[in-house]
Amino acid sequence: MLNSFKLSLQYILPKLWLTRLAGWGASKRAGWLTKLVIDLFVKYYKVDMKEAQKPDTASYRTFNEFFVRPLRDEVRPIDTDPNVLVMPADGVISQLGKIEEDKILQAKGHNYSLEALLAGNYLMADLFRNGTFVTTYLSPRDYHRVHMPCNGILREMIYVPGDLFSVNHLTAQNVPNLFARNERVICLFDTEFGPMAQILVGATIVGSIETVWAGTITPPREGIIKRWTWPAGENDGSVALLKGQEMGRFKLGSTVINLFAPGKVNLVEQLESLSVTKIGQPLAVSTETFVTPDAEPAPLPAEEIEAEHDASPLVDDKKDQV
């Protein structure tokens, strides 16, 4: 009965206005009130502040600053094996496995369309048909920066407007096509393991989605699909990220979906639905063998992006809308 009530609220509540209100409140500097809210949040969700670079909650001027708090470098070591792809986020695995032609498993008895997830982009979908996927859910207590599973060259980013349903286990099991309905940012990379998509999915109360190369992607929520492209390789204007490097962040909890091309990687056998994930731990292994490179993988970045700063895109000249 309680679950039915919670699901009904997902359809009834004004999710967009709630999200805007939450984003507005989380960006305000309110002194002792901000600290009180953070302390209550830490206690309720059992947040481990010992892992944070700033464990003192009084250090955060806004709730958003606290929410995207950086971790100490040593608490998330990155697996250095060049054949291993690592987990992109702290959280739990919602689902993982093989993409069956165009079908991705959302929950037991519920599939959704790969092409719908990719906003109808059939050319991009063709890269991943019969490939592999991993869906990682970030709860409110988790670290909310998202990192690279492997070295990658950014080729395309698509912002897709959509609903703002919660993305917890209850909604995943009961809301059809949840991840293909919600607002999301699709990032396509060239990697040593073939093409890889890393998709940041929005949800109720998620105030914004950001990337390290373009700053805040949403808000504003303009209701139109936007697309950006970048050149390959070492060409001028290209964006290269290293394994373990931060690529984006959420302000409040959400979901990351990774897509891998067919025949390129095998997921770690021990992983299953509800497995706990930690950034830097093994997620998948290449089907080929690579020689260990001289360069070390990037540690967790120490440099901060201001929590309330809406950075201008670094590649405005590459932007076009569709």
From Swiss-Prot:
Biological source species: Escherichia coli (strain K12)
Membrane topology: Peripheral membrane protein
Active site residues of this protein: 90 (charge relay system), 147 (charge relay system), 254 (charge relay system), 254 (schiff-base intermediate with substrate)
Pathway noted in the entry: Phospholipid metabolism; phosphatidylethanolamine biosynthesis; phosphatidylethanolamine from CDP-diacylglycerol: step 2/2
Residues the record lists as N-formylmethionine modifications: 1
Activity regulation annotation text: Inhibited by ionic detergents such as Barlox-12, an amine oxide, and sodium dodecyl sulfate.
Catalytic activity: a 1,2-diacyl-sn-glycero-3-phospho-L-serine + H(+) = a 1,2-diacyl-sn-glycero-3-phosphoethanolamine + CO2
EC number: 4.1.1.65
Site (Cleavage (non-hydrolytic)): 253-254
Protein name (record): Phosphatidylserine decarboxylase proenzyme
pH dependence statement: Optimum pH is 6.5-7.5.
PTM annotation, UniProt: Is synthesized initially as an inactive proenzyme. Formation of the active enzyme involves a self-maturation process in which the active site pyruvoyl group is generated from an internal serine residue via an autocatalytic post-translational modification. Two non-identical subunits are generated from the proenzyme in this reaction, and the pyruvate is formed at the N-terminus of the alpha chain, which is derived from the carboxyl end of the proenzyme.
